[in-house]
Amino acid sequence: MKNNISMKDFYEKYNNEELTILDVRENHEYAAGYIPSAQNFPLSSLGIEFTKLDKNQKYYVIYQAGGRSARAYDFLEAQGFDIINIEGGMNNWPGETK
């Protein structure tokens, strides 16, 4: 069972806590606008890049619309990471972007 968080709840946490956010969109999508503290880990290279992540850290995963972040979630969870999928993705992000 996936550990999901609504955009509303995520945004509230984002404004009150320091969260580690993985934006799994491709580089060109990320460059077009991203959550200021998000790290870019494109889904296409996640199978290699995941080794740079800390298994003792909780990660919030986001994509454009939420669908592909579920694939990243499944992969990272299978590797033993603590993952939370942000429902709705960047299409529903209410805050500012860089």
Describe the role of every protein-language-model region.
Residues 1-19, 27-58, 67-98:
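Rhodanese-like catalytic fold shared by cysteine-dependent sulfurtransferases
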Residues 62:
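Short, surface-exposed ligand- or partner-binding patches at beta-edge/loop junctions that are enriched
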